[in-house]
């Protein structure tokens, strides 16, 4: 009798399962009976499970208890002995779903109970540990909790990704087989879900009933069947000669292919279709808000598995069934070898070239390109000294200086915020790994907005000074900018005075605590001072400070080129734009201290050579990536301080004869510096040197 009862149960379950799986994927409208298949199927399963117990058929509380036992203890095989320890009560579950303990069990109540069971499956640990009591909430709370499973999805619909997350939980919970799985879209159609948005408040309970009914029958849901181990071996043999045997020459050919990777050139059309899954199913089961380790399939068809990129966990699942350990033994590796070889031959896991992370620069590249960069930096400092020699026109000198000061602020702050900080935080590595432009560039746009806030407040303050108090005396022309290597501020006032047909230029030196100005004519410096053998203390201070500054610049450039060629290029541009106005101020102070033009140029050149010493020290100490990150972190802070604390206030309070033209050139320099660093930050992966 028991045999025939069990046989009838399994025949009914099998017929119901086949009726669901055999449904076609055509676009025909589902009938009302099909849309209600989930709840009716679950009721049918409950009636079969309670066969022989006529009392339970007429009491909804007993049916819900049977459903709760089967759902709460899915791995239990012997249902005739012992009790199942449940974390839910059938009465509370039925009342929360809007049912009655005495009335007949309605389909709507069955669907709601199924939805509550899905919530229980997802949050079983919290519920069973008494951290979450389901009887304290209304049914609508659980409904909206499932609809809002992912924060990045529409909270009014259960999207396909959210459905995949739920099905991943149910597969793990019920321990269903990974073969002959029903696809998510077929499951949605069986539940009466017509739209592309997914299930809503009305259709989600039907979907929940279908999921519970099929899971109780052991049907795998939401994931296509993985290939068998023999399929990988078949692929390898078919790839080489399409027979059941391999010759030694073909084994040699296989080794050559794996060594040279020539086979990947033949499969370039597949490289853009697949990527290795970043989140394994185990991770997805722990966090429903993240995506599961499932292939994103097209609406019409899914790709063949032989061009699919399998994760390490999936290969273990295919070749080593019931393998729960994270370690792989030698015997296990022997079984995994065909899968690894097949993945290498198919090239399905190789990323496109434009998304591959670039290798670190070689020793020759680091030393070669960085030496060229420091050489250009030295020549750029000489350009700054050359601009001071054109002091005959005070107005043009002031405008050129402010243009370069704005350019220095833009490049220094832009390099720190758009390049160095994202690099030390690892954002560039994520961009190279995933290759999604809009997603990976999101931090860059946010940091650009930060620069926009800085520029906006600079405009407000500058306009306030120009419009409200145009006659207020500002700070000297170049104050802190040229003073970070010494303690003197510099205000070049280039006054053209007619004296025997000669133009006399003067430079005003102004200390931070001195309110009086000392006028030192460049052209009328006493010969005893200009040709004397002694060098003033001011010149020595400038020489030492400038040497240390250039040494630090070389150290930073060496570290940047050790990290990547792109980082070296951006850092060199930022330092070069900063160095030109800096050297203009230092050279002017050297001339005013009594040195001749030739001596001042020589001293400026000698101090610039210390950058090479810093360069080669930086290249040697920054071989370790951790050292690189720390040096670049300090460099970003130094750049922000120099640009925002030292030079931007000077731009705000500069005193000039043409304030609006100065204001325009300052903004041109700022925008040009930020825009150039933005282009480098966005397209640095495409830079080829």
Curated annotation (Swiss-Prot):
Q: Does the keyword Transferase apply?
A: no
In chain numbering, motif XEXPHE-motif lies across 578-583
What glycosylation sites does the entry record?
6, 133
- Region annotation (Disordered) maps to 275-303
| Localization of this protein | Membrane
Q: Per the record, what are the reactions this protein catalyses?
A: Zn(2+)(in) = Zn(2+)(out)
Report the main location listed first in the record: membrane
Describe tissue expression: Highly expressed in brain, namely in the hippocampus, frontal cortex, striatum, hypothalamus, and cerebellum (at protein level). Also expressed in neurons in the Purkinje cell layer of the cerebellum, medulla oblongata, and the frontal cortex. Abundantly expressed in the testis, namely in the spermatogonia and spermatids within the seminiferous tubules.
Basic and acidic residues composition bias: which ranges? 278-303
Keyword set, alphabetical order: Glycoprotein, Membrane, Transmembrane, Transmembrane helix
Q: Which GO terms describe its cellular component?
A: perinuclear region of cytoplasm; plasma membrane
Instruction: Kindly list the cysteine pairs connected by disulfide bridges.
Output: none
PANTHER family, from UniProt? SOLUTE CARRIER FAMILY 39, ZINC TRANSPORTER ZIP12
Annotated function: Uniporter that promotes Zn(2+) import from the extracellular space to the cytoplasm across the cell membrane. The transport activity is temperature dependent. May play a role in neurulation and neurite extension. May play a key role in maintaining intracellular zinc content at levels that reduce the inhibitory effects of rises in oxidative stress on spermatogonia and spermatozoa viability during spermatogenesis.
In Swiss-Prot or TrEMBL terms, this protein is called Zinc transporter ZIP12
Give the organism, scientific name.
Mus musculus
